[in-house]
Design a protein with these regions (language model features):
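Hydrophobic alpha-helical segments, principally membrane-spanning helices and signal/leader peptides
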Residues: 2-3, 142, 249
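A gly/proline- and charged-residue-enriched helix-loop-helix capping module
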Residues: 133-150
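N-terminal secretory/targeting leader peptides
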Residues: 20-136, 154, 159-377
Length: 377
């Protein structure tokens, strides 16, 4: 337990800052970490239920389980959260309401599923041609991003903590090669996200909705010509390369992503401070772990799918990429002009970029990285 707490306190220096300056972060520092339950018999035994938008065995669900495991470890087993995969307690599209109403105490989600309630939730879960996973991480922990989550979920009687940050998705997997916008215009494609759907419509691309569980069969039967799911390791888990060998990358429609845990505010307020600290610390540790673990698995799956499974990577020309980029920004600016909540989140993201982009440009290849080629040997 001592070693875990030392690691937890170290991870806690990542911090979860509030909106505004990093100095006003309210981060989980060593003083707060000491308030985590360290085996005190004075603290109550608490049991929660945690639903999920993810199915059993899905990598995202394993992250939900890891979060719950950490909460239990940090409280010496006095606070336990039992995980239930999608469909066990409720359908994925019911989870938000179940947590909001207190039917269950918490739920693991991806905010884009709640875009029908408010499009601001989509920005909290992914962006088109904008934030990378590392951008999300820095924005949430240092740039005031966490407060945007609290503000939005707080409107629905919830508090929220990110527990998993994803890097850019794989791209579109298709049964025919995609090398241009024109190619996509002649296809029926599964694409997630309200904003991505609007951008696709402006680009003349025919988008359809297909459940992730039906994606393999839909591609196999020709119901759709292409589709996206997630990052390489998640795509590999569905074996999409067996029915769609072409792989158009990068994923302009989802350049990074965030999963988290929704917590009913009444249930949260009933917890002793030590258990609230344990939840926050578990979320910080889980986010840090998954940021590297998930990308490492993507490295391995990409190599496998290209070298063993015969996937063929295609790219579009720069003019088409520029058209897509400009269209994505146009969609965002239009939504920000008509949705105050969306604008609140979008403005915070733009403030972050204003701070980050100057130094990012100076770093060039030495910032987010580059690949060695023959000229570098």
């Amino acid at each position: 337990m001592a070693s875990l707490l030392c690691g937890a306190i170290g991870a806690a220096t990542l911090g979860l800052s509030g909106c505004g300056s990093a100095a006003d972060s309210g981060m989980m520092d060593a003083a707060n970490a000491n308030a985590v339950a360290g085996g005190s018999s004075d603290l109550p035994v608490v049991t929660w239920k945690m639903g999920s938008t993810w199915g059993d065995g899905n990598i995202h669900f394993t992250c939900d389980e890891r979060f719950s495991e950490l909460v239990s470890q940090l409280t010496d087993g006095r606070f336990t959260i039992t995980n239930y995969p999608e469909g066990s307690l409720c359908a994925a599209n019911q989870l938000f309401d179940y947590v909001q109403n207190g039917t269950i105490q918490c739920g693991g989600d991806w905010g884009g599923y709640w875009s029908g309630k408010d499009t601001a939730f989509e920005l909290l879960s992914t962006t088109m041609d904008n934030f990378t996973g590392m951008d999300y991480y820095i924005w949430i922990t240092q740039g005031g991003g966490l407060q945007c989550y609290q503000d939005m979920y707080g409107k629905y009687n919830m508090t929220y903590f990110p527990i998993m940050i994803n890097h850019a998705e794989s791209g579109i997997r298709s049964t025919r090669p995609i090398t241009s916008i024109k190619d996509m215009q002649s296809m029926k494609i599964r694409l997630g996200g309200v904003m991505a759907g609007r951008a696709a419509e402006k680009l003349g691309i025919n988008i359809t909705t297909v459940a992730a569980s039906e994606l393999y069969e839909s591609l196999q039967r020709g119901v759709i010509d292409g589709g996206e799911f997630s990052t390489p390791c998640s795509d590999d888990s569905l074996k999409l390369q067996e029915v769609a060998k072409y792989w158009c990358s990068p994923a302009w429609y989802q350049s990074g992503g965030v999963n988290g845990v929704m917590i009913n505010k009444d249930a949260w307020n009933q917890l002793p401070e030590e258990y609230q600290n344990a939840i926050q610390m578990a979320a910080e540790i889980c986010t840090s772990e998954q940021l590297s673990r998930y990308l490492w698995m993507d490295f391995e799956s990409t190599k496998k799918m290209l070298e063993e499974d015969g996937c063929i990577v295609t790219e579009m020309n720069q003019d088409d990429w520029n058209t897509i980029r400009n269209t994505c920004r146009e969609v965002y600016e239009e939504e920000a002009a008509q949705n105050e909540n969306f604008n609140m989140v979008y403005s915070s993201m733009k403030d972050y970029r204003e701070k980050a982009d100057t130094y990012r440009a100076m770093l060039g290849d030495y910032g987010w990285g580059f690949n060695y080629d023959d000229s570098a040997k």
